[in-house]
A protein has these predicted regions:
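Secondary-structure boundary elements
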Residues: 38-49, 84-100, 171-173
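Glycine-rich, often proline-containing surface loops adjacent to acidic residues and nearby aromatics
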Residues: 8-21, 54-74, 162-163, 188-197
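TerminUS-proximal long segments
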Residues: 184-241
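Long, hydrophobic/aromatic-enriched structural stretches that serve as scaffold segments
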Residues: 1-59
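Aromatic/basic-lined ligand-recognition segments
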Residues: 64-153
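Short glycine-rich, low-complexity/disordered patches
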Residues: 44-56, 95-109, 222-238
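Metal/cofactor-centered catalytic core regions of large enzymes
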Residues: 135, 148-149, 162-166, 203-206, ...
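Low-complexity, glycine/alanine/valine/leucine- and proline-rich hydrophobic stretches
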Residues: 143-193
Length: 241
């Protein structure tokens, strides 16, 4: 299955070449979910899905969500193009780390694009408490030290931001000097943030984003005393251009 934001549909393709499509458009989540599951059944794919959205308080299960919602094709296309541009920089940043690192991936619950580096050292149990997200999953995800960065499109009064945090937060991390100048520490979020607008309007957006990713990682790794010589590698000049 894949989301096609050129034709604005969901493609379901099997290894035998059978193909089904479900249009992306205005409507209810319940109807969309029902259409996707019906197409899967027609292909002989019987799958169980946990239908309550994760990381969202007071979430409505997909099949019960009958609120009509709009679909702005132009806004979706712009958002997708932005994510593709960010992914390129995130992957370049990821390539200079030889330790364990997540892929550049998208979290549907919090709706953020992220990449996470691991030091290899254990971390204290995560406190959990994320809405509609099992505590044991949070504890497993944060069982080892991480430095994580990503992009969040905002919501609930917050503008779009790039973010960077460390778990557990090492002493002094929040006082580190990071780049670019528009980057600041947020006590509310417990992480460094950089307004999306600061990157979008920069003379060199790629360089501005890379400066944020690298400087916040440097701050986390130094404060937590990661074995940086073992975990990092230098990219050839042509790979960084």
């Amino acid at each position: 299955m894949r989301l096609d934001f050129v034709n604005h549909d969901v493609e379901i393709e099997t290894t035998t070449g059978e193909l089904r499509r479900v249009d992306l458009g205005p409507g209810t989540v319940g109807n969309f979910y029902g259409s996707v599951m019906a197409q899967l059944r027609q292909l002989g794919i019987d799958v169980e899905v946990y239908t309550t959205p994760s990381e969202i308080a007071d979430a409505t299960p997909f099949e019960k969500d009958d609120e009509h919602r709009p679909y702005d094709r132009e806004a979706v296309t712009r958002f997708w193009h932005a994510l593709v541009s960010m992914q390129r920089v995130f992957n370049q940043f990821r390539a200079s780390f030889r330790g364990k690192c997540s892929p550049v991936h998208f979290f549907w619950g919090s709706f953020d694009l992220a990449v996470t580096r691991f030091s290899g050292k254990g971390a204290p149990p995560h406190p959990g408490g994320v809405p509609n997200f099992p505590d044991w999953v949070a504890r497993e995800a944060y069982s080892h030290e991480v430095s994580s960065a990503g992009f969040w499109p905002g919501g609930n009064g917050h503008d779009a931001i790039f973010y960077s945090y460390a778990y557990p937060k090492p002493d002094g991390f929040e006082r580190a000097s990071v780049r670019p100048d528009a980057a600041t520490w947020s006590d509310e979020l417990g992480e460094f943030v950089l307004p999306y607008s600061a990157v979008r309007e920069a003379d060199d957006p790629d360089a501005a984003l890379m400066a944020f990713l690298q400087s916040t990682y440097d701050a986390a790794a130094d404060a937590a005393e990661w074995d940086r010589s073992a975990l990092e590698c230098r990219l050839p000049e042509d790979a960084r251009s």
